[in-house]
């Protein structure tokens, strides 16, 4: 396995994901993790991430210096390379000007660049620069702007690269990372089949004959977890709370798919309860609080009536764990708890089999477990459901309008082969009414916003460049089939500054 030491780079998670794509298990630790903690994980190699700081800052994050004499293979990326060079006696200088964007390696040599020929495009993002390698080290790559773009240790077990091999803008970056894994002798058995085998063993050993309670939303994480519990043969109850805020046909689709695959599923019809609690509420934060409160009440009632349960299973993913732990260069984002706010008298032990997995790895497991593509490849859907896509007060009438429009948009994306090319797509019903023409008469109808984004990690996202012909057909079909909607607009805002959801 490979440990990635995090010094605050926006790409740290991407490094870990890229390694797993190469079938090498990886974990992220804080950059200043002591040697004892590092060795506890028995890594076969270490990667020092980039970071936003300068190695000249007095309070810049630094690794335990004992790591450099540990004998472990090392790869320093950007800031990580500068730390490596500075610690081992090389020279790092404040660059005359920052180097950001695409660059070309005009020279590269050695096993780290095996299989690469000619000039190689890479992505730079640094201010300081290594101007001389440590004693005995060699310069193994350069660009026109940077004569020290990569360095190698005398024994060939440690390297530094000034660029970012993990990003898409370094097209041959995966080859460079793979070369490093081979040089380090890293075991590469992190396959979906191996992961599934390990998770089944873990769940069976942990749960034993005790009962497990799970809340399912119809999303890929909780649905896959329900299938895992069923395949493991543990005594479980999966609870699907229908809060009346679902998309068109969603309850029937989720219920049918999970029951067919052997999940012990209980569906709770709580539509009236939720809509009554939301009556007259327009503030988005208040809506979220009410929905959370009502969900907890419905879930708690099931737990008491059908209990006792020893474990509460959650589809917590590795990014949730990372965000909860915090790290260098970023404040702690949140304390993660998927089913937060449960009463204290409901005493559960948490069972989180996916706590070390990324979303794409869960999708791979879902494929092995037989989850239908309609659920496996489904776009993310917020816990509060359509309540945060109906701006203003949530009513059954407005929900029904949005359901029909959203279904048309999603169906069209599938028809055009675009659904799997965007990371998330949604329709938002605004409280704005716009004047239009129906026949010979003026008519006021709702303004509907369509949104689609592309992203790798949902931390940042770009608006999807859908064909104008597609958007034209979507607007025509929606206004024709949903007469309550008089105007359709398309959201061209990226994240940041906007969030993906409107509320």
UniProtKB/Swiss-Prot annotation:
SUPFAM superfamilies: Adenine nucleotide alpha hydrolases-like, Class I glutamine amidotransferase-like, GMP synthetase C-terminal dimerisation domain
Ligand binding (ATP): 217-223
Residue ranges annotated for the GMPS ATP-PPase domain, each copy included: 190-378
Catalytic residues of the enzyme: 78 (nucleophile), 164, 166
Catalytic activity: XMP + L-glutamine + ATP + H2O = GMP + L-glutamate + AMP + diphosphate + 2 H(+)
Entries under PROSITE patterns matching the protein: GATASE_TYPE_1 (PS51273), GMPS_ATP_PPASE (PS51553)
Annotated Glutamine amidotransferase type-1 domain residues: 1-189
Subunit structure: Homodimer.
Protein name per UniProt: GMP synthase [glutamine-hydrolyzing]
Species in which this protein is naturally found: Thermus thermophilus (strain ATCC 27634 / DSM 579 / HB8)
């Amino acid at each position: 396995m490979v440990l990635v030491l995090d010094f605050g780079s926006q790409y740290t998670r991407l490094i870990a994901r890229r390694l797993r794509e190469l079938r090498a298990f990886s974990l992220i630790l804080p950059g200043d993790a002591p040697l004892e903690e590092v060795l506890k994980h028995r890594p076969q190699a270490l990667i020092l991430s980039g970071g936003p700081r300068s190695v000249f800052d007095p309070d810049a994050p630094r690794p335990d210096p004992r790591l450099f004499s540990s004998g472990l293979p090392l790869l320093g990326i950007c800031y990580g390379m500068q730390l490596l060079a500075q610690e081992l006696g090389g020279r790092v200088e404040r660059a005359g000007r920052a180097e950001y964007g695409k660059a070309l390696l005009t020279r590269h040599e050695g096993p780290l660049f095996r299989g690469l020929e000619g000039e190689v495009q890479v992505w730079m993002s640094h201010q300081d620069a290594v101007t001389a390698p440590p004693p005995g080290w060699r310069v193994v790559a350069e660009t026109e702007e940077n004569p020290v773009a990569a360095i190698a240790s005398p024994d060939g077990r440690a390297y530094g690269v000034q660029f970012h091999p993990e990003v898409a803008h370094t097209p041959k970056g995966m080859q460079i990372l793979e070369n490093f894994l081979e040089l380090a002798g890293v075991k590469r058995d992190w396959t979906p089949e191996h992961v599934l085998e390990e998770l089944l063993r873990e769940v069976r050993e942990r749960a034993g004959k005790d009962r497990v309670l799970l809340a399912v939303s119809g999303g890929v994480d909780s649905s896959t977890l329900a299938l895992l519990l069923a395949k493991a043969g543990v005594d479980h109850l999966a609870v699907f709370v229908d809060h009346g805020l679902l998309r068109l046909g969603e309850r029937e689709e989720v219920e049918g798919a999970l029951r067919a695959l052997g999940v012990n599923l209980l569906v709770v019809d709580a539509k009236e309860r939720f809509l009554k609690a939301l009556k007259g509420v327009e503030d988005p934060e208040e809506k979220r609080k009410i929905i959370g409160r009502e969900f907890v009440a419905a879930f708690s009632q099931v737990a008491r009536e059908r209990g006792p349960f020893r474990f509460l299973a959650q589809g917590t993913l590795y990014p949730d764990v990372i965000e909860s732990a915090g790290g260098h260069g970023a404040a702690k984002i949140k304390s993660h708890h998927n089913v937060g706010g449960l009463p204290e008298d409901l005493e559960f032990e948490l069972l989180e089999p996916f706590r070390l997995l990324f979303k794409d790895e869960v999708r791979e497991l879902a494929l092995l477990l037989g989850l239908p593509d309609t659920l496996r490849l489904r776009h993310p859907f917020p816990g509060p459901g359509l309540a945060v896509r109906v701006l203003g007060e949530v009513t059954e009438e407005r929900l029904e309008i949005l359901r029909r429009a959203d279904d048309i948009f999603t169906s069209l994306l599938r028809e055009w082969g675009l659904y799997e090319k965007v990371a998330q797509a949604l329709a938002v019903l605004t409280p704005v009414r716009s004047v239009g023409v129906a026949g010979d008469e003026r008519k006021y109808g709702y303004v509907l916003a369509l949104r689609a984004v592309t992203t790798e990690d949902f931390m940042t996202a770009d608006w999807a460049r859908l064909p104008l012909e597609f958007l034209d057909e979507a607007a025509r079909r929606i206004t024709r089939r949903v007469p309550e909607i008089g105007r359709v607009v398309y959201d061209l805002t990226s994240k940041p500054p906007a969030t993906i959801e409107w509320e």
